[in-house]
Amino acid sequence: RNAATVSDNLTNGGRKKLNISNFIGYVPADENENFSWSMEGYINDYGIAQMAKKLADQTNDATKKANYMSEYYYYLNRAKNYSLLFDDSGQDVTSKWLRGRKTDGSLNLGNSDNNTGFNPFWWGADYTETNAFNMAVSVPQDGIGLANLYGGRDQLADKLDTIFTTDGGYIGYGG
């Protein structure tokens, strides 16, 4: 479980805020680009889970198999923590987003140019070199789970249509 171990030196990689995210399921908003750190971590966790499953399938040693399967389930469950970042408070899919959260679980509202409200066009803040539009469907490890969050396959298709048909007007450091 080294991917769940807090590192003192992130110069050559690692994960930010593991001392907190291991317990609350995401990197909190007091860390710049927190949302992206969280989402990348979930994808990494899914990869680690798949590796553990493969190792379990290849060994005949019962103890090793049990340990690998324990790792598999641990990381597979962590990979699904993206659901903690889903904001379903909108009336329809056009106003539902994957967003950054604060340590207390409340949504981060300070990603706009005046830091007073959520703006899905805002490039940066919670997001690394992107915005809420680009990250709204960035869950390659669990497409069915993502569709369920939006309300089903048709609603996920509607969200994709919204992303593809909304005019860019991005703002922030990448806009």
Regions inferred by a protein language model and the residue ranges of each:
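Active-site core of glycosidic bond-cleaving carbohydrate-active enzymes
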Residues: 1-80, 86-175
